[in-house]
Amino acid sequence: MINLRKTHPLMKIVNDAFIDLPAPSNISAWWNFGSLLGICLVLQILTGLFLAMHYISDTMMAFSSVAHICRDVNYGWLIRNMHANGASMFFMCLYLHIGRGIYYGSYLYKETWNIGVILLFAIMATAFVGYVLPWGQMSFWGATVITNLLSAIPYIGTTLVEWIWGGFSVDKATLTRFFAFHFILPFVILALVIVHLLFLHETGSNNPSGINPDSDKIPFHPYYTIKDILGLLLMILALLLLAMFSPDTLGDPDNFSPANPLNTPPHIKPEWYFLFAYAILRSIPNKLGGVLALLASILILLIFPLLHTSNQRSLMFRPISQTLFWILTGDLFILTWIGGQPVEQPYIIIGQTASILYFMTIIILMPLAGMIENYMLKPKW
């Protein structure tokens, strides 16, 4: 009998990607985050779809419609809390996924890595426009501050900002288009994810040792399907605990007040997952400089393959580079903390120091460490 799974045009694609896929035998739990991100995306699209059925993208109605979802819609509170905290879960998995890629040298699969960076930008854009939709104080002022950054672009800046706003301030037109963007972007992300997987399956997965694993491969199913299901259960458990017991922990109290253009909140800050970039933006006392630093802090990921100087792919056997990696991780935690603090001393100088360290570690120290390790491993006889 012909195995339909291996011959049917559609099932063959699924089979080659999730069942008979040859996978390295030694990939650790750090390789779970790719599948978890896929689950997060599906979860966000589904909860978002149900929210969109009840949400009204009008400045007079948006805030009330979100309150209506939480109070009057069947399990609306759960759908809304799962969606809001699902975004936090998404970014947690995303940052761990990127960290794994940096630690184990996965960025040397250049096409997969570059598509991943584009995905990061698309997800950040989606999260930003989504945060504006409840039309609370922080939604409104966050939208005003972040879109205003585009006015730093010489010559066309002001025109560009007014074009994005659809008027002379953040208003009804802005909210309506942000809702449209927030609805369409996840499907763009879905398409990019397929391309990301396509390029990954051209080369096969990397592994912790960084050595070519072709001589020792195992089928994806059942070994990694069961491992992914364990990861999924743990993530869903964490998400449900967060969404049911403390759904507002990661949110901003200011967003419980309806948007008021006449009253500015004392501290305007984005959600926790943007704070590191916000701290880098604020550390430069110049609008254009800050915007460029903000962009550079994420675009720098694109040059990781060019900055790789080591003869070894992974950091598994490279103690100096490992130390620098964990310094970079700690630095990102410091930047995240600083991004949530007011602009006053000592936070200003800490933020500036952490920003300099961030760029210096990636551009100078890590390539240098790779070269030193190469020299140390050279036979001296």
Swiss-Prot record:
One Gene Ontology term, aspect cellular component: respiratory chain complex III
List of residues binding a ubiquinone: 201
Pfam families linked: Cytochrom_B_C, Cytochrome_B
Q: Which domain of life is it from?
A: Eukaryota
Q: Where does heme b b562 bind?
A: 83, 182
GO biological process: any one?
Answer: mitochondrial electron transport, ubiquinol to cytochrome c
Q: What is its main location?
A: mitochondrion
How is the cofactor bound, as the UniProt entry phrases it?
A: Binds 2 heme b groups non-covalently.
- Which family, according to the similarity comment? Belongs to the cytochrome b family.
Put simply, this protein is called Cytochrome b
Q: What is the lineage of its organism?
A: Eukaryota, Metazoa, Chordata, Craniata, Vertebrata
